[in-house]
């Protein structure tokens, strides 16, 4: 997720649009130089803390005064955010992070390079000759890995000074966690083989290692070496019970992960990159589209164009299949002079990467659509299209939602030049109309909203959008006329051909019809507002419908009146809790005896109802 450069960056507004998920945030100056990278357990809270109140010190004041934009990357956990933060700091060297982080904060697994290698936890500078695996999110993760290494491969952990002076095996040998190379109880060749296998495991090559051990086990069985075969069998069993990899290794293969999100005729392609096994974070791209391109087509074009200028890794994960995949794959392979594989049907860790990229693409696109600079541009385009003399400061949109006339709800959403003003959204439960009469529902909602504005001298919108055609627009016109409101510009948003986005017709109160086209920033703004009104109406309708259906289930039971119904729902926290209860538990509710409890249970579970004679309905 990102915010584009602005003259005066509004950190509070940016933070308010973030999710509460864990992740990493990055602050950039106006010249696009990276100022700071940090991690957060809850992005909205952490980022917002920078812009609430006075900065705590001069360094923070200086840094925040230079912020022109921010990016965030959502992660699956705070531990993953910590790893990504460390990797970004190392690879990008942000100006204000230099004195805040060093390797002492992050533990590694060290496998030394010597005649009898040892495996151990390591912090600090990499002064010891060996392979370093990590960084890990914490000491606990390293210790779990070391415990596994000792159990599976029986590698030593003692310091060299201890190793050189032992005359008999230590306790680690006695409990089966070391092969005692210190007193020559294991051949050098066998120990080096154990080191090789441990390295394969730490590199994430568990599948290859498992196949190798399986082959060795079969060979041992054929040679009637049953004891060795049993040891290999146990090793294979333990290996398969572990996760394939628990860290990011410095020598893992390069990988790019691409996800595409589309909304309101706009698209975002998010690139998540790994180089030398390190997560380098995300980059967001907003390709120009004609409003009719599918996400698959947009992603295919991006892959072709982006990797024409950037060296592709050997593996590129895509969140969907793309047209001409084989052709693109062949072209990239030829240009790169190495095999480039495009993949989308993946499992395990790679599926997690795709999910992460897809989630970030959606969040980034939503942020882009609601970012202040983009909203100002679209708002200005709307003003020009409608021929208004002044800036559009407030837009409202109404939509109706119901299921075959049931539980009709109208929504009213509010946007200003900076985006949605969610605190002023309103829903109206529609009643007293013929079920399914959208015209009457729209008129009732408009009357209720604007009558209150007239009575209380409330704020009126500059533009009022009505999701519907000429009929819905006429109802809104009549409602405003009855209330004496004349200075609100009405616009009906009629669905386009085959209900395709970008083909909407805008109907004005004087009968004129505008078709600005998918590429129009003004229409994109209208689409965004209309889609938000639609979402808000559907959410309200579903909640009202569910509540009505829950209540009606109890109303159908003889002996259940309003008082008992309220007691039951309050006691169990709703119908779901009531359905999960047994007859005895239901009978504990005040005013419910055993016979009534049996009837309630039977009704909720579709069983034959007991006789209801003799029950009243309080």
Curated annotation (Swiss-Prot):
GO terms for cellular component: cytoplasm; excinuclease repair complex. It comes from the Bacteria. Interacts with UvrB in an incision complex. Belongs to the UvrC family. SMART domains: GIYc, HhH1. It holds the Pfam family UvrC_RNaseH_dom. It is found in: Cytoplasm. GO terms for biological process: nucleotide-excision repair; SOS response. Residues 207-242 form the UVR domain. GO terms for molecular function: DNA binding; excinuclease ABC activity. Signal peptide: none annotated. CDD domains: GIY-YIG_UvrC_Cho. The UvrABC repair system catalyzes the recognition and processing of DNA lesions. UvrC both incises the 5' and 3' sides of the lesion. The N-terminal half is responsible for the 3' incision and the C-terminal half is responsible for the 5' incision. Residues 20-98 form the GIY-YIG domain. Gene3D superfamilies: 5' to 3' exonuclease, C-terminal subdomain (1.10.150.20), GIY-YIG endonuclease (3.40.1440.10), UVR domain (4.10.860.10), UvrC, RNAse H endonuclease domain (3.30.420.340). This is UvrABC system protein C. Keywords: Cytoplasm, DNA damage, DNA excision, DNA repair, Excision nuclease, SOS response. The lineage of its organism: Bacteria, Pseudomonadati, Pseudomonadota, Gammaproteobacteria, Lysobacterales.
